Amino acid sequence: MLLTQFQAEIAQLPPTQHQFLIGFSGGLDSTALLLLFAKLREKQPHLMLRAIHIHHGLSANADAWVTHCQQICQQVAIPLIVEQVKIDQHKGIEAGAREARYQAIRQHLLPNEMFATAHHQQDQTETFFLALKRGSGLAGLGAMQRKSTLYCLPICRPLLTFTRQMLLDYVKQAGCPWVEDESNTDSRYERNFLRHEVLPRLRQRWPHFDNAVQRSAQHCFEQQQLLNELLHAEFAQHFDKTERTFQLRDFATRSQLKQNALLRLWLAQCGLSMPSKVQLTQLIQDVILAKSDSQPQFQLGEYCVRRYQDTLYLTPHFADLSSLRLPIHIGETLTLPDHLGTLSLQQQAGQLQVIWSHPQHTFTSILPLTEDPIEVRFRYSGKVRLSPTSANKDIKKLWQQHAVPVWLRQRIPLIFYADRFKSAVGYFNAI
């Protein structure tokens, strides 16, 4: 019966969705999810399953949990990835652990895989109450959906309609052991406080309380979807789907309410969690309304919202590369820092071909051969002469002519012959 219901949930996903990465802590809920996927694979052999266990290092039992998860996954023939993470406790243990967890998962998720979590009906109620406590709007009160994007990860939650008791009965019947995380009883954590001290009394008073909360969450989600639909035409005027940027042209003519809604819709399209009202107001004041010649940015979780001219960009936090000087020789390939790809120098037809293989594009520059030492740098603030007949130009003007945003200028490899600037690879060369 439970497997039939689970199969129906998976059937609601796109028909081409056959690959799943299962979040597996070893606890009751994720054990039920793992077993259900393993059983479903017997009926649907085309399913490609992997599991991932995140070692947070917060419990003395963490190593034992890894061993347990490895044994269970071996029994059901599902490959297991174990990833140990470091938690930034300045963000709080709960928030820091969640962010570290999803960062690790994102590194392992394959292009056609979907991350599957074991959230069930009682988890949904807790999520709704936590959103209520934060003063969330429709998007937050919509709680968790069967399929969504979080931290830029495609996620499915096929157990949302299942109660914890159903999962408990299923795992017991399967005779499969699970682990208990001792922190789950610590009511200092908000979710545990709700789970142990608040919600049991409500369920005792109203036995169908979880069903009612789930209906309310669904109503909120549907109202938010309707609002997004009504905003679609105006949003399309601002959103560049390819670059995931937000154009500010005519933005100031919108009402404050509509400005907030359009920005939230943009951030949601980019897979970010919703900012608070205070954060949204600060984003508008510090970035959108900043002087046109400034370099405004606003930190939002793992990302930065930046503005260049009349466009908002969403970028990761970048490392400071300004002091780097990387030697390179002809015939070599250099791995560039901070996920910028590789750069190679090849001698070709009496010239030097510089190839920058960036994860998104490939850039090429052709330079004269030299016997001088060659370096790759990421910062230069002097003058550039493009041809024998042209005047020296400030490099800042050249970046502006190529419409390169300020923060990207220090992420483009610059070629130097000794101390002479020769090329911004893929953009312009000096004589």
Curated annotation (Swiss-Prot):
Encoding gene (name): tilS
Matches recorded under SUPFAM superfamilies: Adenine nucleotide alpha hydrolases-like, MesJ substrate recognition domain-like, PheT/TilS domain
One term under GO cellular component: cytoplasm
Molecular function GO labels: ATP binding; tRNA(Ile)-lysidine synthase activity
Biological process terms in GO annotation: tRNA modification
Compartment(s) of residence: Cytoplasm
HAMAP family associated with the record: tRNA_Ile_lys_synt (MF_01161)
Leading EC class: ligase
InterPro entries registered for this protein in UniProt: Lysidine-tRNA-synth_C, Rossmann-like_a/b/a_fold, TilS/TtcA_N, tRNA_Ile_lys_synt, tRNA_Ile_lys_synt_N, tRNA_Ile_lys_synt_subst-bd
Keywords on record: ATP-binding, Cytoplasm, Ligase, Nucleotide-binding, tRNA processing
Protein name: tRNA(Ile)-lysidine synthase
